[in-house]
Amino acid sequence: MKTIALFGGSFDPPHTGHIAIVKALKRLNYIDNVVVMPTYLNPFKSKSAANATLRLKWLKEIFRGDKKVIIDDFEVKQNRSVSTIETVLHLLTHYKKVYLVIGADNLASLERWNRFDELKEIVTFIVATRDEIEIDARFIKIEVNETISSSALRDVLDVSRLPSVCKDEILKVYKD
């Protein structure tokens, strides 16, 4: 059984920061695969700008041909908001170990996550740097030199931050 890094999120829209995180994860020699898993609906949000099926399609296009990256539709197929603990427990039936990847901006709310006490016992957290947020030494840290967020990108639609393979389609969806 393999060891994976679970990189979940809304990816609403996917951008160069997400790609940089995946590249950084692929360099970690103790991870066999990076599992990228879009949410059906983020548990902390009431809606997504782009529907889950479309976000899943974009991720498949972005990482097509990359043998270390697995695009997983588990959460999308649930047709509901899925908590991280539920996803991790599902993945542990298929993989030996799950590293859970989060952005440093999620650290402040981490303890409010559903069943966090259980979650922290079954995963090892990998935290991607973001802005100047301090990352506690108990977490594995990966350096990512991208400062964009999906919400900021929806506001400004900076084409240079969109993956080239699907940027036209992303622009069309978010401009409407």
Predicted regions and their residues:
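Nucleotidyltransferase catalytic core that binds NTPs
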Residues: 1-176
